[in-house]
Amino acid sequence: MEYHAGDYDVIVVGAGHAGVEAALASARMGLKTLLLTLSLDNVALMPCNPAVGGPAKGVVVREVDALGGEMGINTDKTYIQIRMLNTGKGPAVRTLRAQADKRRYQEEMKKTIERQENLYLKQAETIKILVEGEKVRGVLTRTGAVFTSRAVVVTSGTYLNSRIIIGDVHYPSGPAGFPYASLLSKSLADLGFKLGRFKTGTPARVDKRTVDFSKMIEQPGDDRPLYFSYMSEGIKRPNVSCWLTYTNLETHTIILENLHRSPLYSGEIKGVGPRYCPSIEDKVVRFSDKPRHQVFLEPEGLDTYEMYVQGMSTSLPEDLQIKMLRTLPGLERVEIMRPAYAIEYDYIDPTQLKLTLEAKHIQGLFFAGQINGTSGYEEAAGQGIVAGINAALYVKEKEPFILKRSEAYIGVMIDDLVTKGVTDPYRLLTSRAEYRLLLRHDNADLRLTEKGYKIGLVTEERWRKFNERVEKINKLMEFLEENQVTPTKRNLEIMEEYGTSPPKHGISGKEFLRRPEINMEAIEKIFAIDGQFPDDVKEQVEILVKYEGYIEKQLKEIERFNKYEGKKLPPDFDYSKVKGLSAEAVQKLNAIKPENIGQASRVSGVTPADISVLLIYLESRKSEDNNGSEA
């Protein structure tokens, strides 16, 4: 029997990494928000890798943090190892990666949600999205509870119609044995959404006590204090090592001789798997010329013996899993605590969404996370905060929040999803960003914190700290521009130490810092300003000075890019009326309904010639409209 269980401004369905960010954003913007989850024990669950960050992903965590989100703060509270990756490369690809204590991560996030004003957490299975006309009106749960709202954000992760597969054993289940959502897919299909089927997998968890680490290579974290969040200074965390080992010919032979028992090759698995995170059997088949593959053992937490075997994702039967693992150096006597498995689940075609992550045909209904065909906790969190912000703005009847490709990796991801769609689980890569030198780990706050403050998500404390940092960056930059490096005896000694030639005349500190062999350490010695500026400020200034030419070039490219982005397209526009467009362009543009010329230019199958035709058509239509108004 159905009954009215409560009225809210925003309802979020699913409390994974997308759901918690969406719900927190909505609540922090002052809206009464309900967060529904299949189980109160799987809030912010890490069903796969117990890690946060990595190339591109780590920048997204910083972007979420800069906007006022929670993933960065929560990771800093609970990590057990942290490293800065790609330190030998340019600033565009440097990023943080942390091993999280997965149980503590969940506990801390749940605590944050429970203490958040305006946010209500409940356990329930959502079975239906309630819609009146073209507007969302709430949700129905399996027990008959009707929760009404003006906006709904669906963040159901890999729980939609999901099933677990281990060899020839398969059964309906959510990740890690949690309940699954069996009826919500039908509700979405009934509402006209096109659904697809994806697959992902996770490796076995092994007992640390049965591992011989003396045969492996230790991978320690960084000793220096590192944080994802700009608010986390002073937090001290442990530094627990990961361990590296390798597969070998014996491992590969076991896999190749048993491919007939792999559901991936027998046809049992129908869903498409992630291209950039293949299973071990897929790697052995696809890269048959490789004699070995890296395997990392990662601790799952401080208070557990479970270790995650990164690089050994598989859906092979359990008896083969143990046989295969025991061929690896250090794992000869290993015991499995949880077997590896594959999981299939439903997702929606993300081209059915606007850049706000709102459905094109149902007002107030938003989607975020793996239901949009992505993979990864970080990608989910990035979408979640944007969907939560836009749900809140929709209820408040304010202008939507859209991040451009030139402003954030989150903007790159969302534009890719809604413009190009997905053929396999989408993963963010630095190569997907045209302006990655501007979308760096170190400047996420400079790009996004003001935006977060304007929409009411950034706290006054964060805003104060941000402005203090900006002031220090400007102060150091001004100092370098105004002060000269001269060839004094003391300075000549410092220059010799750093292998640089003395200037004939005095040059500015900024000009001196441009030299490849000179860093901020040398600048501090020259001007005797050691300890006067924080490390993050010095890093920022050094990057801005050394890469000034490249940054200016990208900013000019963005100016050209923004001209296209500024040319809006009507949402109900019929592209078949435009003479000269290719048949493929008409079909794709009518399906995607891009919001502007820039987005239209990125639709697959649309050529530069098609864009030229479209621009001419829009100009002629504009002239006709102007002539009509003059008449």
From Swiss-Prot:
Its main location: cytoplasm. NAD(+) binds at residues 273-287. Keywords: Cytoplasm, FAD, Flavoprotein, NAD, tRNA processing. Gene3D superfamilies: FAD/NAD(P)-binding domain (3.50.50.60), GidA associated domain, C-terminal subdomain (1.10.150.570), tRNA uridine 5-carboxymethylaminomethyl modification enzyme MnmG/GidA (1.10.10.1800). SUPFAM superfamilies: FAD/NAD(P)-binding domain (SSF51905). SMART domains: GIDA_assoc_3. Disulfide bonds: none annotated. GO terms for molecular function: flavin adenine dinucleotide binding. Pfam families: GIDA (PF01134), GIDA_C_1st (PF21680), SAM_GIDA_C (PF13932). InterPro entries: FAD/NAD-bd_sf, GIDA_C_N, MnmG, MnmG-rel, MnmG-rel_CS, MnmG_C, MnmG_C_subdom, MnmG_C_subdom_sf. One of its GO terms (cellular component) is cytosol. One of its GO terms (biological process) is tRNA wobble uridine modification. It is found in: Cytoplasm. Its cofactor is FAD. FAD binds at G14, A15, G16, H17, A18, G19. NAD-binding protein involved in the addition of a carboxymethylaminomethyl (cmnm) group at the wobble position (U34) of certain tRNAs, forming tRNA-cmnm(5)s(2)U34. Belongs to the MnmG family. Homodimer. Heterotetramer of two MnmE and two MnmG subunits. This is tRNA uridine 5-carboxymethylaminomethyl modification enzyme MnmG. The gene is mnmG.
